């Protein structure tokens, strides 16, 4: 396998972060040639519709997985937060690279503002219910309006006055070099204020599970700490039978005592349920988190397993 075809979404962010990961592989395996193969997924095509309305799991990965299984490509690079807990049959996670900044951030139209001092009724752009409910818990007087599209489009809409502030992931801004541009007025949101999406900031390489040669090659870019932490978070996702469109969050940190896990679920009335646990066994910790969320009022939520 001299030439390795790498599937990715067509967006500027997806292409950039895929190229960054490929550059790591190329440095370790200079004898290999890597070719990026871009795809437009269902989630990319239907930008005028909310992800909740599109529905289903893997709206940003299904087309790429089909291409992988059909042999059109050898591997694919995804934002792990977009991937369902259960992969398509025949696919495997070949590597999870070192995690970027997990935090969300607010970007303001006017300089000098923070979440605390935004004027009452300010309009915030986000299509993420997870982000909205956590910000509303801090500022119930704010208004929210859906916002989808690539990062450049979202920032342009902010600067043109459609929103007073927008919410984006720090990881994407860093990978695209936006933080080097002084014109942005950014407030990073600490995880104590806004828990991130499950696996936010992590990239995953997917390949066919029988491709032992490629699996061996990909081991070089695996970050074991990141892989262990996101495995706990994705266990929460699996236990909830949910996907990236649902208002859930989880953030696991590996430490000397095992794992610290924070998880959040938004109820249908917008109330946020939080749990915080410490334990040695990540899988058991995820199961405990889901049980505690249920005990606190998540019973009967439509996406939880019966």
From Swiss-Prot:
Keyword Magnesium assigned: no
Pathway given in the UniProt record: Porphyrin-containing compound metabolism; protoporphyrin-IX biosynthesis; coproporphyrinogen-III from 5-aminolevulinate: step 2/4
GO annotation terms (biological process): protoporphyrinogen IX biosynthetic process
Enzyme Commission number(s): 2.5.1.61
GO cellular component, one term: cytoplasm
Transmembrane segments: none
CC cofactor: dipyrromethane
Gene3D superfamilies listed in its UniProt record: Periplasmic binding protein-like II (3.40.190.10), Porphobilinogen deaminase, C-terminal domain (3.30.160.40)
Catalysed reaction, written as an equation: 4 porphobilinogen + H2O = hydroxymethylbilane + 4 NH4(+)
Key word Lipoprotein present: no
Keywords: Porphyrin biosynthesis, Transferase
Post-translational modification S-(dipyrrolylmethanemethyl)cysteine, affected residues: 244
Entry coiled-coil feature ranges: none
GO terms of molecular function: hydroxymethylbilane synthase activity
Pfam families: Porphobil_deam, Porphobil_deamC
Enzyme class: transferase
Family: Belongs to the HMBS family.
Function comment: Tetrapolymerization of the monopyrrole PBG into the hydroxymethylbilane pre-uroporphyrinogen in several discrete steps.
Note: The porphobilinogen subunits are added to the dipyrromethane group.
Subunit architecture: Monomer.
This protein's name: Porphobilinogen deaminase
